[in-house]
Amino acid sequence: MAKITKTFQYGKHTVTLETGEIARQAGGAVIVKFDDTVLLVTAVAAKSAREGQDFFPLTVDYQEKFYAGGRIPGGFFKREGRATEKETLISRLIDRPIRPLFPEDYKNEVQIIATVMSMNPDIDGDIAALIGASAALSLAGTPFKGPIGAAKVGYKNGEYILNPTVTELKDSQLELVVAGTANAVLMVESEAELLSEEVMLGAVTFGHREMQKVINVINELTVEAGTKPSDWVAPAKNEGMIAALKEAVGDQLASAFQVRDKLQRRDAISAIKKDVLGALAPRATIEGWAAGDLAKEFGELEYQTMRGSVLSSKVRIDGRALDTVRPISAKAGVLPRTHGSALFTRGETQAIVITTLGTARDGQVIDAVSGEYKENFLFHYNFPPYSVGECGRFGAPKRREIGHGRLAKRGVLAVMPTLEEFPYTIRVVSEITESNGSSSMASVCGSSLALMDAGVPIKAPVAGIAMGLVKEGNDFVVLSDILGDEDHLGDMDFKVAGTAEGVSALQMDIKIEGITEEIMKQALQQAKAGRLHILGEMAHALTTPRQELSDYAPRLLTIKIHPDKIREVIGKGGSTIQAITKETGTQIDIQDDGTIIIASVNAIAAQAAKSRIEQITSDVEPGRIYEGKVAKIMDFGAFVTILPGKDGLVHVSQISSERVEKVGDKLKEGDLVRVKVLEVDKQGRIRLSIKAVEEGEGVQASAE
C-alpha cells in the first residue's frame, strides 16, 4: 500500500495522520504528528477467538520512550521499565471509549500499542494516542463501530480552549478530555477548579463538536486506504435454548432482586443459577447446548430483569428511590498514631483514609521523558479482595487501582493548599474495606475528612457521588449513588466530585449511544443535590481543618537566607549541617533559593536548629561584643569562635592592656571570653579585641 497522508488544523496544532509506510505487517498502523509530538499507533486483531474464550481480550499499552525527549533513562539498566503511572492512566483513557464499540459477542484478542517517538514537552501524547488508536482500529478491518474522535478542553476567562498546551493548562481552570463517535459522547475525564455544572456540560459539548473534524479525517483515510469491512458475523442466537432458560427461571430472578442485602442477593441469584442450569443439564446434553452459552444467557436474563424492574417501578434493587443516597456514617480521627484519619461509610461501601505529612524531601521524584520533577501530593488507593468478600491476588496495584486513585486525587486537588502555603509533602492512602459501588467517590469523601483531621488547610470539604443510567428507547431513569450491580448492568457510570461551590472532577463512561445533552444535564443536577446531601452528612464529623497538627506530625519551620550563605550552613563536607541535625534531632532541607525548612516532631528542637542557623548566617557587626570560645592558640594571638563557623583573630596586642609575652599565659583553648569586633575587612577576616572590652567596662565603672 502506498503512503497516505492526511493533514488538518486542530485548535492551534497541525495534525498529520500517515499510514502505509511504517509497521505494514500490523493490522492497522498510523503515524500521528501533533506538531513536534509524534506517535506510532498500531492495532492488531487475532483472526479467531481462543477456544472457550468468554470475554473480550482487549489490551491497550501506551508507552513514552525516553529518546522521544532526547534523554537516557536513569537507573542501572538504562532502559524503560514497567509502565509509569502516567502511561497506565493514558492506556486506560484509550481503552474506555473503544471497548464499548466492539460487538458484545466479539471475543477475538485485540492489541493496541501507542508509542511516543518524539515529544514536545508542551504537547502531551494523550489526545494524539486516542486519535491514533481510533485510526489504527478503523484501518485494521475489525468490527469496530467507530471511528471515535478525541479533544482536550481548557477554560479561561469564560472561554473554552481547544487542545491547550501544557503551559496553557497551568493557567486554565479546567482540563477535560472527551471522546466519542460522530453521534455520541462515550468518555469524559476531567479536573476543574470548582466550576459550575453548566460550564462542565458546555465543555463536553464544545469538545464533542470540535472532534467531528477528526472523525471525518479518519473516515477519509480508511476510504483512501481501501480498508475492507470486517467479515466477522455474530453467532446466531439459540432461540430454543433461550426459551427453555426463561421458562425454567420464571419469576425467580425478579424475586431475588427484591433481596436488599448485596451478599444475600448474590447468594440467591447464584442458587437460582445453579438450580436452573442443573435442571436443564439433561436437555442441554441432548440438544448440544454448551454450559458457557447457558451461563451467558442467564447473565442476559439478569440484565433484563434488573433494568425492567427499575424502569417500570422506579424503585431500585435495594429499595431506594431513584435519587436517594444510601445511609452515611463519617468519623474523623479514628487512628491514634497517624497524622490524620477518617472512616467513611456509605451503605455497603466503606473506606478508611489516612493522611501522612512529610518534608519536601519525602516528595516523589518522577523521571519523565520531558524531564525530572517532584510530586509533593500523593494519593494511593488500595482495593483488597476481602472488600467484596472474595479471595484474590494481593500485591502491587493494578491498573484499576491506579485509575481510581487518580480520580480521587483529582477530586480534592482543587482545594489543596500550595507548597508555599503549607510546605509539607502530603500522602493520602485510601484503604477500601467494603465495596458495593462507587469506592472511588468514598475515597474522595474520606480523604477530605482525613486531610482536615491532619490540619491540612484545604479550601473547603469535598464530596463525590457516582450516578448511573438505565435507558431503553426513549424511556430512561438516572440513578444517584449507584450500587455495584447498577454499575455493571446499567448504561452509564458518571462520577462527580466537588464542594458546595462547584465541580472539582468529572468522569463519565457510557456504554451505549444516544446519551443526549438532556440526560447529562439531569445527571449533573441530580449529582449536585446528592453531593450537597453528602457534604451535610460529613459535616457531623468535621467541617474545617484542625488548627493543631497531630503530636506525631513533623513541625516545619521555614527561614530564608541569602543564597550566598548556603555554603556556610552546610559547612566543609557537610560538617556544619550534620552537627546541627545530630545535636537537635531535626531534619533540614536547603533549597537553591536560600529557603531552609526545618522539620521535627519536637517544636523546641526545631526552634534550637533555627537559632543555630540564624547565628551562622547572621553578619558579624563591627563594634559589637560577642561571647566566644578560644579555638586555637598561636604565637601571634588566638582564634576565637564568636558564631558557628565564624572565627576571628585576637592579636597578642589585643589580649590585655598589660604586656603579654606568651599567649598561652593568658588564654587556653576552650576558654570562654568576651571580645569586641574591631573590623571585618574586605576578605571577611575578623579582628577581635579582649582589651577593648575590658577598657570599655573600666570606663563604664569609673562613670558610675
Swiss-Prot record:
The gene is pnp. Component of the RNA degradosome, which is a multiprotein complex involved in RNA processing and mRNA degradation. Coiled coil: none annotated. Mg(2+) binds at residues 487, 493. Belongs to the polyribonucleotide nucleotidyltransferase family. Its cofactor is Mg(2+). InterPro entries: ExoRNase_PH_dom1 (IPR001247), ExoRNase_PH_dom2 (IPR015847), ExoRNase_PH_dom2_sf (IPR036345), KH_dom (IPR004087), KH_dom_type_1 (IPR004088), KH_dom_type_1_sf (IPR036612), NA-bd_OB-fold (IPR012340), PNPase (IPR012162). It holds the Pfam family RNase_PH. GO terms for biological process: mRNA catabolic process; RNA processing. PROSITE patterns: KH_TYPE_1, S1. The keyword Transferase applies. Keywords: Cytoplasm, Magnesium, Metal-binding, Nucleotidyltransferase, RNA-binding, Transferase. GO terms for cellular component: cytosol. Residues 623-691 form the S1 motif domain. GO terms for molecular function: 3'-5'-RNA exonuclease activity; magnesium ion binding; polyribonucleotide nucleotidyltransferase activity; RNA binding. Residues 554-613 form the KH domain. CDD domains: KH-I_PNPase, RNase_PH_PNPase_1, RNase_PH_PNPase_2, S1_PNPase. Involved in mRNA degradation. Catalyzes the phosphorolysis of single-stranded polyribonucleotides processively in the 3'- to 5'-direction. This is Polyribonucleotide nucleotidyltransferase. The keyword DNA damage does not apply. Disulfide bonds: none annotated. It is found in: Cytoplasm.
